[in-house]
């Protein structure tokens, strides 16, 4: 028996990392929002690694925060350890990574959602969507509740027709033995969506009290207080270490001897797994020349003894898992608390989406997270906030918001998905971004806070602080550009200590700062200090902008050229069959993706420069024909 459950502006299906960002963004923009989840005890659940951030991913978390999202704030309040990675490399690849207290992370996020105005969190399983005249107008749950809305965001993670595989055992399930969503997957097929089958996996968890840590290497957090969120002022100083160990020759022998029992090699697993997070059995086969592989032992929280065995993702039978664990130094007497497993799930082919993450087939229907073929909490959250923003914009009758590839890693991620698609769970890497020196960890606020403020996601107080920081950066750059450093014993002694060549003549202060060895702390010892003491973030920005000025300027020139191509718009209903001379493969791909600009068309796989030249001529002819008529 069905009944009317209520009417909303936006409905979000799922409360994982994509869902919570989507729901919070829509509600904060003023949309009356309903968030439905299979289990209220699994809001923002971390079914795999208990961590947030890392290369590229950490920058996404900063971008989410700069837009007004929650992931950064939440991990700042609930982490057990934080480290800045790649500190010995340039600023383009530096990234923050935090070990999460996964249980506190969930609790804190759930509390935030429950206290958010305009947002109702409810437990419920969505079986069908309400479609009227090609538009999504709500959802129907398995209890018969009908909820109406102007826009719906689907963020179902790995629950769509989820199947856990552990050795010879397999059964329908979401992650961690939670209830899967079967009917919604079937319904999406009925609606004509192309689905693919992907797979991911997780390692065993072991009892921390049974680890011999003396045989491992300690991995402490950074002494310097760090944070993902630009709003964080209180820092956690009581950190817990992680530990490093390695597989052994015996580990590899046990795995090799049991490959016949591995679902990956027996044919039980049909889904495509993530290239950049292979299972341990896959590593042993693909990298047979390596005598050992790194294993990180990561605590899952402050109030549990469970330890996550990072690097040992597996779907081998339980008895094999226990045997191979005991061959790893430090784990000889270990007790396994949960076995690792593989999980298969349905995802949609993401080229069926516009860059707003709205589906091309059904207006008002958005998808975000692992349903779009990505892997990782951060990639999911980045899509989630954009889908939530655009669902709210749709509900309000406003234009969608698209981040381009020069604005954010989130823009790179979404553009890759909707333009190129993916044949495997997509992981964001710094190498996927053309403009890495622009898309840095340290400047996410300078890139995106203005946009977050315009959307109503950034408070007046935070925006005022941001504008003050912007102004301080410009003033300090102007101040030092007028200074000259003269050679002296004091100056040359400092340069000698830093391993930098001594000065024989006066130099512009900016030329001295550009030296690789010169940090701003040292720089302030040889120039007058500013009248007002500035924040470390201001000094950091000035140093990076001055040091890498030439490289940054080159990237901006590239961006300007790209923008010219992005500004050449393509009508959504363009008839590609009417364009003579385009290669058959290019025509098929362009009809499938339906790019919105010539820039996007140039990134579609199978489309070459000759095809783009023909497309440009055709569009120009059409424009001239319209003008003359």
From Swiss-Prot:
- Which residues take part in binding FAD? 14-19, 126, 181, 370
Q: Where in the cell is it found?
A: Cytoplasm
Write down the PROSITE patterns for this protein, in alphabetical order. Answer: GIDA_1 (PS01280), GIDA_2 (PS01281)
InterPro entries on file: FAD/NAD-bd_sf, GIDA_C_N, MnmG, MnmG-rel, MnmG-rel_CS, MnmG_C, MnmG_C_subdom, MnmG_C_subdom_sf
Q: What is this protein called?
A: tRNA uridine 5-carboxymethylaminomethyl modification enzyme MnmG
- In which organism is this protein found? Shouchella clausii (strain KSM-K16) (Alkalihalobacillus clausii)
Its function, per the record, reads:
NAD-binding protein involved in the addition of a carboxymethylaminomethyl (cmnm) group at the wobble position (U34) of certain tRNAs, forming tRNA-cmnm(5)s(2)U34.
- Biological process terms in GO annotation: tRNA methylation; tRNA wobble uridine modification
Looking up Pfam families in the UniProt record yields: GIDA, GIDA_C_1st, SAM_GIDA_C
Names of the cofactor(s) = FAD
What is one GO cellular-component annotation here? cytosol
Key word Cytoplasm present in the record?
yes
In the record, the note on similarity to other proteins reads: Belongs to the MnmG family.
Q: Name one GO molecular function term.
A: flavin adenine dinucleotide binding
- Which positions in this protein are listed as binding NAD(+)? 273-287
């Amino acid at each position: 028996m069905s009944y009317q459950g209520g009417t909303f502006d936006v409905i979000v299906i799922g409360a994982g990392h994509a869902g919570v960002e989507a729901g919070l963004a829509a509600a904060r923009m003023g949309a009356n929002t309903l968030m439905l989840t299979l289990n209220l005890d699994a809001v923002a659940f971390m079914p795999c690694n208990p961590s947030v951030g890392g290369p590229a991913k950490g920058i996404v978390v900063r971008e989410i925060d700069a837009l007004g999202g929650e992931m950064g704030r939440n991990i700042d309040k609930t982490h057990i350890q934080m480290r800045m990675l790649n500190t010995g490399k340039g600023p383009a690849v530096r990234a923050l990574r935090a070990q999460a207290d996964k249980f506190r992370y969930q609790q804190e996020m759930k509390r935030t959602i429950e206290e958010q105005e305009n947002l109702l969190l409810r437990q419920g399983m969505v079986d069908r969507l309400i479609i009227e005249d090609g538009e999504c107008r709500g959802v129907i749950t398995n209890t018969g509740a009908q909820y109406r809305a102007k826009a719906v965001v689907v963020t179902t993670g790995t629950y769509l027709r989820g199947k856990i595989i552990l050795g010879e055992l397999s059964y329908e399930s979401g992650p961690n033995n939670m209830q899967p969503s079967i009917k919604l997957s079937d319904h999406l097929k009925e609606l004509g969506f192309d689905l693919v089958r992907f797979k991911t996996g997780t390692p065993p968890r072991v009892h921390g009290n049974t680890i011999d840590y003396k045989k491992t290497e300690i991995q402490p957090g950074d002494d310097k207080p760090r944070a993902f969120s630009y709003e964080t002022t209180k820092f956690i100083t009581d950190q817990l270490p992680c530990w490093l160990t390695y597989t052994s020759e015996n580990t590899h022998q046990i795995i090799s001897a049991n490959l016949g029992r591995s679902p990956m090699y027996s044919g039980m697993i049909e889904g495509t797994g993530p290239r950049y997070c292979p299972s341990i059995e896959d590593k042993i086969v693909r990298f047979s020349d390596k005598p050992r592989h790194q294993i990180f032992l990561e605590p899952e929280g402050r109030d549990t003894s469970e330890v996550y065995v990072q690097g040992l993702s597996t779907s081998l039978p339980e008895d094999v898992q226990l045997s191979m664990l005991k061959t790893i130094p430090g784990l000889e007497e270990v007790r396994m608390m949960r076995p690792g497993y593989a999980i298969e799930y349905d995802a949609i082919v993401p080229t069926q989406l516009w860059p707003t993450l709205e589906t091309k087939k059904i207006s008002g229907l958005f998808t975000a997270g692992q349903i779009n073929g990505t892997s990782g909490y951060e990639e999911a959250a980045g899509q989630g906030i954009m889908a939530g923003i655009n669902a709210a914009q749709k509900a309000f009758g406003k234009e969608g918001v698209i981040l381009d590839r020069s604005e954010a890693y989130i823009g790179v991620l979404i553009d890759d998905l909707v333009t190129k698609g993916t044949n495997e769970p997509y992981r964001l890497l710094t190498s996927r971004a053309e403009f890495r020196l622009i898309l840095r960890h340290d400047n996410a606020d300078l890139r995106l806070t203005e946009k977050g403020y315009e959307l109503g996601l950034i408070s007046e107080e935070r925006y005022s602080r941001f504008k003050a920081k912007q102004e301080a950066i410009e003033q300090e750059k102007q101040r030092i550009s007028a200074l000259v450093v003269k050679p002296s014993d004091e100056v040359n002694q400092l340069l000698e200590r830093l391993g930098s060549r001594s000065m024989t003549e006066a130099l512009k202060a900016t030329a001295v700062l550009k030296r690789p060895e010169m940090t701003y702390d040292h720089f302030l010892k040889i120039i007058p200090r500013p009248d007002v003491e500035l924040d470390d973030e201001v000094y950091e920005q000035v140093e990076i902008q001055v040091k890498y000025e030439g490289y940054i300027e080159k990237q901006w020139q590239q961006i300007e050229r790209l923008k010219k191509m992005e500004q050449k718009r393509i009508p959504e209903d363009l008839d590609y069959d009417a364009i003579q001379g385009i290669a058959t493969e290019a025509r098929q791909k362009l009809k499938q993706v339906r790019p919105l600009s010539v820039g996007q068309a140039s990134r579609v796989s199978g489309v070459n420069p000759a095809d783009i030249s023909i497309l440009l001529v055709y569009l120009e002819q059409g424009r001239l024909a319209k003008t003359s008529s």
